Structure formats: structure tokens, C-alpha cells
UniProtKB/Swiss-Prot annotation:
Gene: glyA
GO biological process: glycine biosynthetic process from serine; tetrahydrofolate interconversion
Residues annotated as binding (6S)-5,6,7,8-tetrahydrofolate: L121, G125, H126, L127, E246, S354, P355, F356
CC terms in the record's Gene Ontology section: cytosol
Enzyme category, top tier: transferase
Protein name: Serine hydroxymethyltransferase
Amino acid sequence: MHSTSLSLAQVDPEILAAINKESERQQFGLEMIASENYTSKAVMEAQGSILTNKYAEGYPGKRYYGGCVNVDTVESLAIERAKKLFGVQYANVQPHSGSQANMGVYLAACKAGETILGMDLSHGGHLTHGSPVNFSGMLFKAASYKLDPETGRLNYDTIRATAKEVQPKLIIAGYSAYPRTLDFAKFKEIADEVGAQLLVDMAHFAGLVATGHHPSPVPYADYITTTTHKTLRGPRGGMILTNSEEKAKTMNSRIFPGIQGGPLEHVIAGKAVAFGEALKPEFKDYSGKVVSNAKVLAEELLSAGFKLVTGGTDNHLILVDLSDREITGKLAENSLDEAGITVNKNTVPNEKRSPFVTSGVRIGTPALTTRGMGPAEMKQIAKWIGQVLNNAEDAGVKNRVHEEVKELCKQFPIY
């Protein structure tokens, strides 16, 4: 007979050992991947709850399974909190990921084979914005806009010209590695000129939008997608927002029964908790510090002689361009990892190297800010990054920095 009351230590010590090692890695290292964060114990408690046992195909009040009264309450709370957080009329909290949220919108706004226009992956876009290896590039005719080769910024005149040339049905405004504010009014103007709908994928900066530290896309976008982790600091998942009743009905049907079956109600519970946390004044203060920490870090890296894409940042992330140095993005990532600093290799505009090697690294401040780190720590971390990248093959330097990183981390426990 299967016992439901045994602990993880009793049932699967191998998995527990891996979890404990990961806990140690997170506690004693500096997490600087821009898309990662530390969610709260409350979110994890909700996500690890008994709700994982419940199937609930459909939407609150209209399920295809019985026994959904309590998960209806949970999902309804998540929806209402999301609507309040972003000032929208309709929200779908069921997408399992940001990618599935995007897929739901594409299927709502376009037919297979029609044209979509998004930021080029190598210039800071996301796989789901039209990459040929992704469903977005397989199911749709994907065109892309790129960054200005001189400034490293978006050039809206160029985007307009591209849109007029390719005549997309959907324009995607969003990124995975762009350190500047997006001008949604200009994107909307371009979309209107070519008769396209506008999707804003705010997965990276949703937490900043929620707190007024980034302009809101709500007045301009037909659809808005986001992940619920990253700067929102919730569980890993996705969400779609809109102010159109008609579009809400379409997007809901594209998520279920279109591309998903049963929603993950335990994850939706975690989303609801995270949205509730984000509605509190403390979260607004946190988001402001995410941005200010990124600016300090950028200034320090510039002072240390590093080249940054666009020369700085307006948001939570920094893109370091190493193309003028001998070191590759891959070596930089590995060397920093050996020193207890986790970043990710990233392509830069006009990339000459393979995406598996790259000429840049992407660095973010959301997780460090969650730990309570501020400007003083950013200055010290910038020094460590410089020391490691300037001595990438020197084990002595990396070991010394790693020990110093551990000491700093002890002062800022995660939980």
C-alpha cells in the first residue's frame, strides 16, 4: 500500500540531497541571472499544497470536473488581484509559462502562416518572438526588427519601415535582454498604421510596471503577456491580460481548450499569493531598489572599463558587451560561476560568435535586491566581477572572490 504520509527524506533521499545542495548553492552564491528571483515562503507553501491533487479543466464557475468549489475561490482571487495590480479588466492566470501565454495570444490574433513581427533573438528578443526553432517561427511567418548598430537601442523609424514592408498581423513589443524602457505609444502607432494588433510581452519587467517603475502597456496593447516570476517574484508561470471583452473570450478559448487541459491550481494559488504581495507598499519600494541597484552596478562596471549595450540601464538588467576583449560570454559565465556569481552568457548586437559561446553576459539585480542588498553591495560586486573577468583563467583570484562572496551572502540570508 502506498503511504501518503512519508517524508521526502524517507521516500527519496537522492532527490532531497539534490534539493539541499541547490539550497546551499542559492544561499551562498550571488544570483544575478536577470530572469531569476527568490519567491516567498508563503508562495512556496501555496504551491506545495494539497491543491496539486485537483483537476479543474475549464474556468471558475464553468468547470468540466466536480469538486472545484475551493479551486474556483483560489483562481478567482488570482484573477481579481492580477486585474487590480495592473489596472485591467480581464486576466487569464492559467498559462503554465510565458511561452504558453504567448502561444495563446498568437493563436487568438493570427492564423497559421500569417506574419508576426518581433525583436530579433540575437538583439535581445525571446525565442517565442519568432525564432525559427520555436513554435512561433514554425507556425507563423516571422519577421524581426533589430537594434540600431550605433546606439544599441531600438530605432522606431526602422521598426515602422519593417512593419510597412512585411505587413504583420501582430507586432510583439518585449524582450529578454534589452536594458532600456520601451515606448509603447510608438509601438501602438506603428501597429495602427499597418493594421496590426499589438502584443506587449512584459515578462521581464512586469514587476516594474505594477509599481510604476516602468510605463504601463495597458493603454496601448491589445494583449499583454507576462511570466509570474522574474520581477514579479511569484511562482514560475504565465498570464495574459487585456481590456477587451471580445479578446478575453478568444484568448481564454485558445488557452483552454486550445493548448492546455487542466490548469495547475497549486501554481495558480502561488500566483494569487504573489499578486497579493505585489499589491503591498513594500513591493513598490522593492521594485524601486531593483532599478536603482541596477543603475549603480552599471555605473561601477562602466567605471571599471567594461562596455555596456546602450551604455547603461533603465530597468533591472545590464548587458555587458565583451566583444572588445579576449574573453567570451561562455568563459565569463563559467569563470564567474566558479567565483560564486551566477550570470548567463548572452548574444550582443552584431554578434560574431555562436549563441553557445556569445560575446556578452546578462546581469540582473532582482534576486540580490530581494536579499536586501543595496548600493554598497553593488559596488563591491562590480569589483568582484571585474577582478574575475580580468583574470578569468586565474584559479587563485576566483577562489578568493568565492570565499568573499560566501561571507557577504551570510549577511543576507534568503529565508
